[in-house]
A protein has these predicted regions:
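A short, surface-exposed helix-loop junction/capping segment
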Residues: 40-51, 126-127, 243-249
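Active-site recognition of the HExxH zinc-binding catalytic motif
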Residues: 116-132, 149
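Short acidic, glycine/proline-enriched loop segments that cap or flank alpha-helices
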Residues: 131-136, 274
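Hydrophobic or amphipathic, alpha-helical segments that drive membrane association/targeting
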Residues: 1-48
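Pan-zinc metallopeptidase signature
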Residues: 2-18, 22, 170-338
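Short pre-active-site segment immediately N-terminal to the catalytic Zn-binding motif
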Residues: 99-118, 135-139
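Auxiliary, metal-adjacent structural segments of Zn-dependent hydrolase domains
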Residues: 32-96, 106-111
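Post-HExxH zinc-binding segment in Zn-dependent metallohydrolases
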Residues: 137-172
């Protein structure tokens, strides 16, 4: 796991969007939805916290055992050591019954982040035993961060991100916003709110930005919860048979399009459904049932919201009150003032 301590080197935003989505899909494919649902509760903060007077080695082993239990790995002897190293931590993926984890020497004095480093490394063990991984090293590390967060231990990695006058640090391969994004995806499935667990102010802000991005992906067209402007744009694109650049969907079947594909908002698997009629689709990977609308039919678009109609938006003009004889309301008011 990388060890970044210079705040100006911390990347932000969502540069690994494709790898994060592929990691979520791979996790659901390997574990199945039933396997993912075996992790409904995140690791409690009390189980991974260090007491001021707690022995370093005994406390580290206690936290490691708590993470092993949380990730549903077999109970075994924990061997955790500290040494000078370039990275934050490393783990031995041997087939033996013990778990061998090495931590950077700096964690001797930064005990509150030991749980974050252990969470990433112990997830490596889980993925090794599941036979789940990507050929590319960086993508495999991103997969590890995503699985750590989605199975309920990754909030520790985001909370280890700090930028203040005393220290500046980030653990893991994902950006802070991407950690918040994956945590928000998990929160939407399990009804969990990790925000009370953050002790870092910048981590809380990154969680908010990631949650906003995850919320934006929950109801893209053709899903029924899309907003009025998105529906109107989708209908226009469907009649043309071509999606606009950057649109979260793609069409096929000519113009108007007869099929549309989009990413599942839960597992990011690409789905294809008939276009132009309302239907209910079930994702074959995560089994999420999605309500799809039938926008884009060759008919007049639905009227915009009332507040937009009042401004004459979308071709709808606010009607003026008229009286018989051709007098408008404004004319009558002027006559009454005389």
């Amino acid at each position: 796991m990388p060890n970044r301590q210079e705040g100006d080197r911390v990347a932000h935003g969502f540069p690994h969007r494709a790898a994060v989505g592929a990691s979520l899909t791979a996790l659901y494919r390997r574990l199945s939805p039933d396997g993912v649902y075996r992790y409904p509760v995140s690791v409690p903060a009390a189980d991974v916290a260090f007491g001021d007077d707690e022995d370093l080695h005994l406390g580290t082993q206690r936290v490691a055992r708590a993470l092993v239990r949380h990730l549903r790995l077999p109970e075994a002897r924990m061997v955790v050591s500290f040494r000078s190293m370039e990275h934050a931590a490393a783990v031995e993926l041997a087939a033996g019954p013990e778990y061998f984890v090495e931590l950077n020497d700096r964690f001797r004095t930064r005990r509150r982040d030991i749980g974050a480093a252990l969470a990433h490394e112990i997830t490596h063990v889980l993925l090794h035993r599941l036979g789940l991984g990507f050929p590319d090293t960086e993508e495999n590390e991103i997969l590890t961060d995503v699985v750590t967060a989605y199975l309920g231990a990754g909030w520790l990695l985001l909370d280890a991100y700090r930028q203040d006058g005393v220290e500046s640090q980030k653990l893991g391969y994902l950006t802070p916003e991407e950690f918040g994004y994956v945590l928000a995806k998990r929160a939407a499935v399990f009804g969990e709110d990790p925000s009370p667990w953050f002790t870092s102010a910048v981590a809380y802000e990154a969680w908010g930005r990631g949650r906003a991005e995850a919320d934006r992906e929950r109801t893209p067209p053709p899903l029924a919860g899309a907003g009025w402007a998105e529906r109107r744009r989708y209908g226009r694109d469907r009649r043309r048979g071509v999606a606009a650049p950057g649109a979260p969907y793609a069409f096929d079947g000519g113009a108007p399009a007869t099929g549309v594909s989009f990413l599942c908002p839960v597992c990011r698997q690409r789905l294809r459904v008939p276009a132009g009629r309302p239907l209910r689709a079930r994702c074959g990977v995560c089994r999420t049932v999605l309500e799809c609308a039938g926008w884009g039919l060759p008919q007049a678009p639905s009227p915009p919201p009332r507040w937009l109609r009042a401004r004459g938006v979308g071709g709808f003009r606010r009607p003026r009150a008229r009286l018989r004889g051709g007098y408008g309301l404004s004319s009558v008011l002027r006559l009454l003032k005389k």
